[in-house]
Amino acid sequence: MFNKHSVEIDWGGRPLKLETGKVARQADGAVVATYGETIVLATVVAAKTPREGVDFLPLTVDYQEKTYAAGRIPGGYFKREGRPTEKETLVSRLIDRPIRPLFADGWRNETQVIVTVLSHDMENDPDILAMVAASAALTLSGAPFKGPIGAARVGFINDEYVLNPVLDEMPETQLELVVAGTADAVLMVESEAKELSEEIMLGAVMFGHRHFQPVIDAIIELAEKAAKEPRELVVIDDSAIEKEMLGLVEQELRAAYAIPVKQERYAAVGKVKEKAIAHFFPEGEEPKYDKLRIAGVFKELEAKIVRWNILDTGKRIDGRDSKTVRSIIAEAGVLPRAHGSALFTRGETQALVVTTLGTGEDEQYVDSLAGTYKETFLLHYNFPPYSVGETGRLGGTKRREIGHGKLAWRAIRPVLPPHHEFPYTIRVVSEITESNGSSSMASVCGASLALMDAGVPLKRPTAGIAMGLILEGERFAVLSDILGDEDHLGDMDFKVAGTEQGITSLQMDIKIAGITEEIMKVALGQAKDGRIHILGEMSKALDRARAELGEHAPRIETFKIPTDKIREVIGTGGKVIREIVEKTGAKVNIEDDGTVKVASSDGESIKAAIKWIKSIASDPEVGEIYEGTVVKVMEFGAFVNFFGAKDGLVHISQLASGRVQKTSDVVKEGDKVKVKLLGFDDRGKTRLSMRVVDQETGEDLEAKQKAEGEAPAQATGE
C-alpha cells in the first residue's frame, strides 16, 4: 500500500531521518523529517496552471506548531490552536526566505508549503528541521525548484562553534545563528550575538554552510529514489522586446534614476513607463503583447540601468558613492509624557521610537511548545501606508512587521541590563513615519536612543545599517545604507546591528548564487565603518542613559521576604495584598522565591506599601511600641490590630493606670491606640499593653520611670 523511501544520516551527533511515501500522499511532495524525537511533516502543492494577472511568484509558506506535539492541550476557551503565534510567523519567514529565490523565473503557479510540527522532544528546536523538510518536499514535488537547500543553527560556546545546540545549551551560547543555502552558496542568515567580532560572525556562517552539506546530499539521495518528473515551464524570450525598449527609453530612464528625491524619481519613472506602454500598445491597434509581460521587461530594464550606473560610475541613485551613509538627524526626548522617546531620521527614512517601562504585571506570557515563559522585553514595529506615500487598510500586524520587529529586538536585547538589576518590563514601539530603505535599522538606532532617554542603563548604544550588493560577473559593488530601490534591484540585503564593541544582530538575504566569503568579508568590514559613523551621529543627541528614569515612569523597589511569609502577605483569597494595593496605590508583585517588587510613580506610595509588607513579613519585637487599631471590644479587654495584620490582646488590666470597670469606658472599635508588646502567653497569643505607653506621645512610661529613678543615683555617683 505504501511506497516508502527514506534516508538516514548522523548529523551533529543525532540521527536525521527523511521519509516519503507514507503520509500525505496526495500532496505533490511530502516529507516526514525526524531529528532526535522531534518530528515535522512538510508538504508542497503547486497549482496545475499559472495564476492569471500576476507578475510575481505566488508562494505561501505556513509553519504550524500543534500543542499535541509536546503532550499539551491549548489554553483559552476553545481549546484549539488559533491564529499563528509570533514564533510560527517568524519560522514561516525563515523557511520562505531561502527557498523563494530558487524558483525558476516565470513560475506563476500558486504554490503552498505547509510544515506541521508533530512531535517536540524539548531538545531540538523544530525550526531547522522544518527548513530541511520543506527543502526536501520541494525537491520531490516536481516544481521548478533549483535546490535543495540545507540549514543549520550555529552556537558559540567556550570560544568554539557548536552545530545545532540543544535547547538546554542556548543560555550558555554567545551566538544564535541560523544559516541556509545550497551546496555552493549561502542564501540566508539570521542571528543574535553578544557583541561578537566580524571574524567570528563570518566564521559561524561558513561553519554552518560546511556542516549542512550532508543534509543536502541526503535530500539528493532521497530525490533520486522518489522525486516526481519536473514540471514543464515555458520560458519566453523577451530579449527582442528589451532591446527595442532600451533604444526607446534608456536615456530618459537613466535621467529619472539620477533624481535623488524618492517621490520625484517615482513620478519621473512613471512617465517613462507610460511612454514605453504607449509605444507597445498603440491606440486603435490590436495588442501584440500581454501588459504584464511589457511591465516585467520594463522592471528588468530598470534594474539593469541602476546596476550598470553603479558599476560603471561608482555613483548611486541619490548621488552617493558606495560607502557614504545618508545624512542623519537624531533627537531624544521628543514626547513629553512618554517614559523615553526618540526621532531618528536617515535620509528619507524616519522612525519615531517610544519606550514605556512597566512592572511584572505587564510581562508577556508566551505559550510555546517548550513551555510557558514570561517575556520582559517587547519591541513592536509598525509600518503604516503613509510612510511610503500610499493609502492602505489598517488591520492586524503583518508578517513583515513581525519580522522587522524581531530583528530590531535581537539587535537590542544583548545590551539590556539583566532583569534582576533593572526589574522593569520594557516595551519599545517603532512607528515608521517615512521609509526609503533600512527602516528596521532605523528602528534599532531609535530604540537605543529611546531606551537611554527613559533611563534604561544599556551596556552601550546600538546602531544598525543595511548593506546591499551589485554583482555582475567579476565586478561587484558593496553599498552602505541602501535605498529601497537598491534593495529591490540589488542582489543582497545585508543588515548588521551592533555597538562599537561588536555585532549584536546579523540578517542576510541573498538573491543569487556566487556570493563568496571574500565579498561577505568586504560587506562586514564596510558595515562596521558605517555603524561606527552612525553611532557618532547618535551620540550628538544622547551618548549614554540618563541618570534618572523618565519623569512619568514607575519606580520599582525590590526586596525579599521569607518564603514562609508569602501566604500571610497575600492573605486568604488575596485579601491582604489587594488591600495593600488599594490603600497605597502601589503595584505589588511577589515571586515564589520571596522577591517582592513594589512599583508606583509616587515615592510615598512605594514607601507605604513596603512598610506594610515588611510589617507582615517580619515578627514584632518584645518591648517595642507600635501603633494599632482596636478591632474588637470584650469584657476582659480589647483586641488590637498592629504591625500589619497581627492582632493582640490588651487585657482590661493593661488598658490604663488605675482600676478600669468596663473596657468600653477606655476604648471603642476603630480607635487608634499605641501599644507595647509585652510578650506571648503559653498558647502563643500576643500580650499588649496601653497602660505603659503615653497615648499622646507614644513614650514608654516604664522606661521613663526607670530612667528617672536611676538619675539621682548616677548624679551621686559622679
Curated annotation (Swiss-Prot):
Mg(2+) binds at D487, D493. It comes from Rhodopseudomonas palustris (strain HaA2). Belongs to the polyribonucleotide nucleotidyltransferase family. InterPro entries: ExoRNase_PH_dom1 (IPR001247), ExoRNase_PH_dom2 (IPR015847), ExoRNase_PH_dom2_sf (IPR036345), KH_dom (IPR004087), KH_dom_type_1 (IPR004088), KH_dom_type_1_sf (IPR036612), NA-bd_OB-fold (IPR012340), PNPase (IPR012162). It is found in: Cytoplasm. Disulfide bonds: none annotated. Pfam families: KH_1 (PF00013), PNPase (PF03726), RNase_PH (PF01138), RNase_PH_C (PF03725), S1 (PF00575). One of its GO terms (biological process) is mRNA catabolic process. This is Polyribonucleotide nucleotidyltransferase. One of its GO terms (molecular function) is 3'-5'-RNA exonuclease activity. PANTHER family: POLYRIBONUCLEOTIDE NUCLEOTIDYLTRANSFERASE, POLYRIBONUCLEOTIDE NUCLEOTIDYLTRANSFERASE 1, MITOCHONDRIAL. It catalyses: RNA(n+1) + phosphate = RNA(n) + a ribonucleoside 5'-diphosphate. Signal peptide: none annotated. Keywords: Cytoplasm, Magnesium, Metal-binding, Nucleotidyltransferase, RNA-binding, Transferase. Residues 694-718 are annotated as: Disordered. Its main location: cytoplasm. The gene is pnp. Its EC number is 2.7.7.8. Residues 623-691 form the S1 motif domain.
